[in-house]
């Protein structure tokens, strides 16, 4: 048998899974040439959440990141994760945007396009696959792996046949939550090798603890490629350690042929990077969590879910959110939990828990999901929930992109009017993220500070522990024994109660004000849209009247309970 090829994920999925996608380009380029020497099948370095995080938190141009990496990586193909018709966003984009984005991605340095759809709806992948093939790139079609009564071995094999019919070069089993058991990995890989002529790539996270065993079972079944992460960025919600997998397969028919000495140097570099980012590294994302076999939360989502709950000052509700997620997933027809459905399901679970009433608050993305605008769910929707979310609306049954009008020229016009377009890629950035891109392109985004790790203990010897105290002429020796150190946080201000106030239901950014001062509105009208946890939330007025005062502006951040406007 031929040896196993390896995809290294340190530049994309590994830090997305453990560091909330916060790794800076300046911390990638110093080691990129060394990684290029290893002989990986590819370096996954772009796509996924990296695009969003670059412009939202890091004040980095994601296109420039791609170009810089390509300058350092000459031999190893650079791979990106592309969400089919969603590209690197959270909704469907029209075909003209998809074409331009893929063409520019290839032009700037992407060699391998790993293309998936969160619902395994082939209609949402066809056009992206077609355009990527036109670039003569390596096109890898993806099966999003999950477990439900509707996801069977036969259904996965049938889907792989559809990908082969579209002339993909390889197929990836994308196990976002580390759910696949050794037995199931063997059976699925063997079936794909028997029923198709495609190279098979297994991509797993270590969340459940089973992944190294599943990798070896996949090798025995004939897998061609495995995804791994250099050890300081491995385990937990990330992939298995590259060095461990290389060593485990050495002197077997599956030997990768990779040099552990070169990998050791790369490991040392990332050990320092891990220390640098230790304030972001969350213990929840690092640990093995067998509850994932119940909740099915993917690796990349765990660290982001923790970060988002922290933003809402609701980390104490984490367990409740985990328990709510399978219920929401069932209501929505058992979608695989991968972007964007992981965000859609996860944030709805957060809202159900924080609001105290299921589906009393619903994001626009959830409404669109029930309308069929993300594609065909694997299973029937909960009809009662559907009525609560979209009323009597009938979902569409065509390819969602078929009802979208071309947007590229309009985005160009808007961007030029705003004076924010310097290159063609800026038009695409604006098209993908119209809420945040203008601020980024105007240079108004500040890089999120990377805080040093908190000191666990005060330096010894600097704080006196024995005091001589005189009381009414008598002297006493008092020993003070340290028992820990307290972090003092600012108290939360009490919310102001103003008559007629319309308040934000979530912490986030105001992306749209739908009324002006002096407008007449009715109870239930949508008066603003707040983007919270990357999803848009309509703010409805609980009462009618005239808009007396607006206290915020588009692009400004608001906290939960902040007054957006007063209507009397």
Curated annotation (Swiss-Prot):
It comes from the Archaea. It catalyses: hydrogencarbonate + pyruvate + ATP = oxaloacetate + ADP + phosphate + H(+). Optimum pH is 8. The modification N6-carboxylysine is found at residue 174. Substrate binds at residues 12-16, 83, 339. InterPro entries: Aldolase_TIM, Biotin_lipoyl, Carboxylase_cons_dom, OadA, PCB-like, PYR_CT, Single_hybrid_motif. This is Pyruvate carboxylase subunit B. The lineage of its organism: Archaea, Methanobacteriati, Methanobacteriota, Methanomada group, Methanobacteria.
């Amino acid at each position: 048998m031929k040896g196993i090829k390896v995809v290294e994920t340190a530049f994309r999925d590994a830090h997305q899974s453990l560091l909330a996608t916060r790794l800076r380009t300046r911390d990638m380029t110093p080691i990129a040439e060394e990684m290029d020497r290893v002989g990986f099948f590819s370096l996954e370095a772009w796509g996924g959440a990296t695009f969003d995080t670059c412009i939202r938190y890091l004040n980095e141009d994601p296109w420039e990141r791609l170009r810089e990496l390509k300058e350092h990586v000459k031999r190893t193909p650079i791979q990106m994760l592309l969400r089919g018709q969603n590209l690197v966003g959270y909704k469907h984009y029209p075909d003209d945007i998809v074409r331009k984005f893929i063409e520019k991605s290839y032009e700037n340095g992407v060699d391998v396009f790993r293309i998936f759809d969160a619902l395994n709806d082939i209609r949402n992948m066809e056009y992206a696959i077609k355009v990527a093939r036109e670039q003569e790139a390596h096109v890898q079609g993806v099966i999003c792996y999950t477990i439900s009564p509707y996801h069977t071995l036969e259904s996965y094999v049938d889907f792989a046949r559809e990908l082969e019919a579209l002339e993909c070069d390889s197929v990836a089993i994308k196990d976002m939550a580390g759910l696949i058991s050794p037995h199931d990995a063997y059976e699925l890989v063997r079936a794909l090798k028997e029923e198709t002529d495609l190279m098979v790539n297994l991509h797993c996270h270590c969340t459940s603890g089973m992944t190294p065993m599943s990798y070896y079972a996949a090798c025995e079944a004939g897998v061609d490629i495995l995804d791994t992460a250099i050890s300081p960025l491995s385990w937990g919600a990330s992939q298995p350690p590259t060095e461990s997998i290389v060593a485990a397969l050495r002197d077997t028919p599956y030997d990768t042929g990779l040099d552990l000495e070169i990998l050791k140097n790369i490991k040392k570099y990332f050990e320092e990077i891990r220390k640098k980012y230790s304030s972001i590294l969350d213990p929840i994302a690092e640990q093995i969590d067998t509850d994932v076999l119940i909740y099915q939360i993917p690796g990349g989502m765990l660290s982001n879910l923790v970060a988002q709950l922290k933003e809402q000052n609701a980390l104490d509700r984490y367990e409740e959110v985990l328990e709510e997620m399978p219920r929401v997933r069932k209501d929505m027809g058992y979608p695989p939990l991968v972007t964007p459905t992981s965000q859609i399901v996860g944030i709805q679970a957060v809202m159900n828990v924080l609001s105290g009433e299921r589906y009393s608050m619903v994001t626009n993305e959830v409404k669109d999901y029930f309308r069929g605008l993300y594609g065909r769910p694997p299973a029937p929707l909960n009809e009662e929930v559907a009525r609560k979310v979209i009323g009597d609306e009938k979902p569409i049954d065509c390819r969602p992109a078929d009802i979208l009008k071309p947007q590229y020229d309009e985005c160009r016009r808007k961007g030029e009017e705003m004076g924010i377009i310097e290159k063609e890629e800026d038009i695409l950035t604006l098209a993908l993220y119209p809420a945040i891109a203008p601020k980024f392109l105007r240079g108004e985004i500040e890089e999120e500070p990377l805080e040093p790790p908190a000191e666990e203990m005060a330096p010894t010897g600097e704080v006196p522990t024995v005091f001589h105290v005189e009381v009414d002429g008598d002297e006493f020796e008092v020993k003070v024994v340290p028992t820990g150190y307290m972090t003092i946080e600012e108290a939360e201000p009490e919310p102001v109660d103003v008559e007629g106030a319309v308040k934000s239901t979530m912490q986030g950014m105001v992306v749209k004000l739908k009324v002006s001062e002096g407008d007449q509105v009715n109870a239930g009208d949508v008066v603003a849209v707040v983007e919270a946890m990357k999803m848009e939330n309509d703010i409805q007025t609980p009462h009618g009247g005239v808009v007396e005062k607006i206290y915020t502006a588009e692009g400004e951040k608001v906290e939960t309970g902040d007054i957006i406007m007063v209507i009397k």
